[in-house]
Amino acid sequence: MPTINVNKVDLERLSNISLSDKLIEDRFPMMGVEVEEIFEEVDKNGKKQNMVQFSINPDRPDYLSVEGLARGFRGFMGITTGIQEFEVLDSDIKVTVEENETRPYVAFALVKNVLMDEFVLESMINLQEKLHWAIGRDRKKLAIGIHDFDKVKAPFTYKEIKGDEIKFVPLGYEDEEMTPREIIEKHEKGIKYAHLIQNDKFPIILDANGEVLSLPPIINGTLTKVTPTSKNLLIDITGTEKEAVEETLNIIVCALVERRGTIVSVNVNGKKYPDLTPKSRIISVESINKKLGLNLNPGEIIQALKKSGMDALYEDGNLIVKIPAYRNDILQNVDLKEEIAINYGYEKFDGKLPSVATTGSKDPVEKKCSAMSDLMIGLGFYEVMNLTLSNQDTLFEKMNLKVDEKDYIEVLKPASIEHRVLRTSILPLLLETLYINKHNALPQKIFEVGDCVVIDEEDTETDTKCKNIKKIAGAITHPLTNFNEIKSSTEALLREFFEGFEFENYEHPAFIPGRCAKILKSGKEVGFFGEIHPEVILNFELEHPVVGFEITIE
């Protein structure tokens, strides 16, 4: 889980409550935020500062700043309850968006008169980087720019340019102008994120004078560098998913309101941002009490929702709940039930001992998976962990597989277009991992042991007609890798865990013909291995030969 370090004095100031170490250690975990450490550190001026390190659940990106954390704690403690109304002032600031294939979505907002100091500046920088990871997938999905608005002139333009079309001074090179192409070749951030630039097309944000604000997702220009004396902040979010871009903007501007900032709208191609209109959901009182095992009346439930920064209206057995725009984690009614449980108080729930004594033990399949992981690490592979949710493009299209929609399970209301299908295979995600890491040194040897979900029409025990199966997959990439290398690693794994296996020639669309083998155990196919087809390698934008295997674990 991501962690944040916050200054205790700053947290007290924003929470509007005196915070003893005991209060912090007792109450924050009850609202779902773990306290890792309370410690002292010396700042750059030689003064001792009392600090607190918190672990933040990935589903609460609004807690990734001291501002959001303090806002949540005020509600949890009953200091400030109910939904907060955010005023957004109109302006004539405009952004023109020209065609942009790489990162087509963009949102802007201006927050004026922020009470800026060293604490606020550090908090904003940390929030920016944490959101890059938590929502932005290390800037692949979205990138954030925060600028000193007083140093630029509206209107602004967001477009794509070629690598040598313009020069500007990037952050970190205070007096050296560079072209975008030079930045990805020489600048530390440019080298790190060069893989996000495609076909020599560089997204760029310019002001009315042609000055560069940002080269997303790489680096901002020095011109708009934010300092402790900045007070008017222009925020830009660019990315590949519209919903994620808009939600991230909402989180940032609502955090800045905690610093007495005033939100001002920006017109982006005719649409005003930010949109802080509360969302709403309808949930029945009966379903809440059934899930929580309680007998709360509507008033008690509404009070719990108010403590979580929401509001609700009771009508005919149902609650119409208003949810603030910065809460992107409320996806289903079960999320509301969790909020009610947290703010009702987990300490109020009665614990009951089961009437039957049981003895726990490790699941045999999990035990086998752990042993397989140890063996793969011994063979020089690095273990990775991907999400079970993926998409058709990664799982099938890039692998040259023709798959009927009946052969996989699709999420009805996905939170992201990248996570709309339950994976049926692990190997495609390993190729995606190699793409993300192709800027790192070779050779690269990775593996994963995990769940895949397949349709099971013969399932009579559940209504889902699907089941989880464990698989292990591995991949190797470097200029000289070949069939023999992956055969050697696969055989080592099979000899240890699969008795009576044999190989058979296999024609698989993702592999080179004649360089792929099927793995059989007692005449039943349990896996395959071989050299990945060059077309598939190019589909994943890889640059070197790749070999791989995948085996179903019984």
Curated annotation (Swiss-Prot):
<keyword id="KW-0436">Ligase</keyword>
<dbReference type="InterPro" id="IPR022918">
    <property type="entry name" value="Phe_tRNA_ligase_beta2_arc"/>
</dbReference>
<feature type="binding site">
    <location>
        <position position="335"/>
    </location>
    <ligand>
        <name>Mg(2+)</name>
    </ligand>
</feature>
<comment type="subunit">
    <text>Tetramer of two alpha and two beta subunits.</text>
</comment>
<feature type="binding site">
    <location>
        <position position="338"/>
    </location>
    <ligand>
        <name>Mg(2+)</name>
    </ligand>
</feature>
<dbReference type="GO" id="GO:0000287">
    <property type="term" value="F:magnesium ion binding"/>
</dbReference>
<dbReference type="InterPro" id="IPR045060">
    <property type="entry name" value="Phe-tRNA-ligase_IIc_bsu"/>
</dbReference>
<dbReference type="Pfam" id="PF17759">
    <property type="entry name" value="tRNA_synthFbeta"/>
</dbReference>
<dbReference type="InterPro" id="IPR041616">
    <property type="entry name" value="PheRS_beta_core"/>
</dbReference>
<dbReference type="GO" id="GO:0004826">
    <property type="term" value="F:phenylalanine-tRNA ligase activity"/>
</dbReference>
<dbReference type="InterPro" id="IPR004531">
    <property type="entry name" value="Phe-tRNA-synth_IIc_bsu_arc_euk"/>
</dbReference>
<dbReference type="InterPro" id="IPR045864">
    <property type="entry name" value="aa-tRNA-synth_II/BPL/LPL"/>
</dbReference>
<feature type="domain" description="B5">
    <location>
        <begin position="276"/>
        <end position="351"/>
    </location>
</feature>
<dbReference type="InterPro" id="IPR020825">
    <property type="entry name" value="Phe-tRNA_synthase-like_B3/B4"/>
</dbReference>
<keyword id="KW-0547">Nucleotide-binding</keyword>
<keyword id="KW-0648">Protein biosynthesis</keyword>
<dbReference type="GO" id="GO:0009328">
    <property type="term" value="C:phenylalanine-tRNA ligase complex"/>
</dbReference>
<dbReference type="InterPro" id="IPR040659">
    <property type="entry name" value="PhetRS_B1"/>
</dbReference>
<protein>
    <recommendedName>
        <fullName>Phenylalanine--tRNA ligase beta subunit</fullName>
        <ecNumber>6.1.1.20</ecNumber>
    </recommendedName>
</protein>
<keyword id="KW-0030">Aminoacyl-tRNA synthetase</keyword>
<dbReference type="InterPro" id="IPR005147">
    <property type="entry name" value="tRNA_synthase_B5-dom"/>
</dbReference>
<feature type="binding site">
    <location>
        <position position="329"/>
    </location>
    <ligand>
        <name>Mg(2+)</name>
    </ligand>
</feature>
<dbReference type="Pfam" id="PF03483">
    <property type="entry name" value="B3_4"/>
</dbReference>
<keyword id="KW-0460">Magnesium</keyword>
<keyword id="KW-0963">Cytoplasm</keyword>
<dbReference type="InterPro" id="IPR005146">
    <property type="entry name" value="B3/B4_tRNA-bd"/>
</dbReference>
<dbReference type="InterPro" id="IPR009061">
    <property type="entry name" value="DNA-bd_dom_put_sf"/>
</dbReference>
<feature type="binding site">
    <location>
        <position position="339"/>
    </location>
    <ligand>
        <name>Mg(2+)</name>
    </ligand>
</feature>
<keyword id="KW-0067">ATP-binding</keyword>
<dbReference type="GO" id="GO:0003723">
    <property type="term" value="F:RNA binding"/>
</dbReference>
<dbReference type="GO" id="GO:0005524">
    <property type="term" value="F:ATP binding"/>
</dbReference>
<comment type="similarity">
    <text>Belongs to the phenylalanyl-tRNA synthetase beta subunit family. Type 2 subfamily.</text>
</comment>
<dbReference type="Pfam" id="PF03484">
    <property type="entry name" value="B5"/>
</dbReference>
<keyword id="KW-0479">Metal-binding</keyword>
<dbReference type="GO" id="GO:0006432">
    <property type="term" value="P:phenylalanyl-tRNA aminoacylation"/>
</dbReference>
<dbReference type="Pfam" id="PF18262">
    <property type="entry name" value="PhetRS_B1"/>
</dbReference>
